[in-house]
Amino acid sequence: MTTMRTWFFTEDCYPDLPPQDEWDSIRVELPNQLCEPENAHRLYNEYLDIWCAADEMGLDIMVNEHHQTATCMVPAAPIMLGILARQTKDARLLILGNPLPNRNQPVRVAEEMALIDVISKGRLECGFVRSVPYEAAAANILPYKGSERLWESHDLIMKAWTTHDGPFNFEGKYYHHRQVNIWPRPYQDPHPPVWITTGGASSTDPVAKHGHVAAIFLAGYSRVRPIFDAYRENYLKHHGTHAPLDRLAYCGLVYVGDDEKAAEKGANELMWYMQANKVSDVPRLRATCPGDTSPKPMRLQGLSPLKGSTRQWGQKPYFSTK
């Protein structure tokens, strides 16, 4: 019988911001002069204490990363996970995840994750994500063919984790590595469980083929159901058996209040934060990058893959050096 596991997650936001009418967006473009180091020091330690408390209460732990944003002060999730690997005792440690298309050294990712797995004595759950479109320019990478780069990077990491008879070379379309022979190797054999985020039914096939966990964020039932159904169908197609229940993961937003009235008030404020965090207000941030979305689903929504947001993506000052 499969037991449902519950993961505690906080995105480590920086809450002390100026009035909202004084800024366009709290992602990518908000000047870091607004981030007071002493305050950030306090917040980091507070968030680490909360994660450790979650471990003591029997919850598993999830961390993520984003870049140049007040919504998430963790630009390097492996560092936070390394701290938690030493400070916690029982919790499974999920990173969701490593933005592989934005990482030019997949072998480095394999090394970092293996190190965390060994320090934690095999408690790592390793997630891979494509990243979000508005962080592509900040990462100095082209968003084109992000899914292809993710899966090629994934293949190199898996090979690095599972090859134990000496160095190998890797020649891919996007990545080329020599003398790959990571130390240490993962604690878990053959490797830590892998999670992949998915935002549509069409992206579930490779996740199901590999038997990885498919995870969904910020989506209601009407969107989640067809994605989960597609994963189950693809898993059955590839493996000849039904997908275990623990192959599907969902991130929900939860607010707890002392009573119904307080809970409703807090939940409404939470929804306001999610909907008004100033991404949608800036065209160049909400833009769909070239190659980020397949033309087929865009056409099904009545959108042109060659117009609108694609032009916005390349407009200045998004790629400006000034």
Language model: regions and residue ranges:
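Glycine-rich anion/phosphate-binding loops
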Residues: 41-44, 101-115, 321
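N-terminal beta1-alpha1-beta2 module of alpha/beta enzyme domains
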Residues: 1-91, 192
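Conserved, mostly hydrophobic/aromatic
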Residues: 54, 65, 84, 116, ...
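An alpha-helical appendage that flanks or caps ligand/catalytic pockets
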Residues: 2, 8-35, 147-183, 223-322
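Glycine-enriched alpha-helix->loop->beta-strand junction motifs that scaffold or abut catalytic
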Residues: 87-90, 120, 206-215, 269
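Generic structural signal for well-ordered alpha-helices
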Residues: 47-51, 78-82, 110-114, 151-158, ...
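A conserved active-site cap/scaffold subdomain adjacent to cofactor or substrate pockets
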Residues: 197-223, 227-228
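Hydrophobic faces of well-ordered beta-strands that scaffold small-molecule active sites
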Residues: 6-10, 61-64, 93-97, 124-128, ...
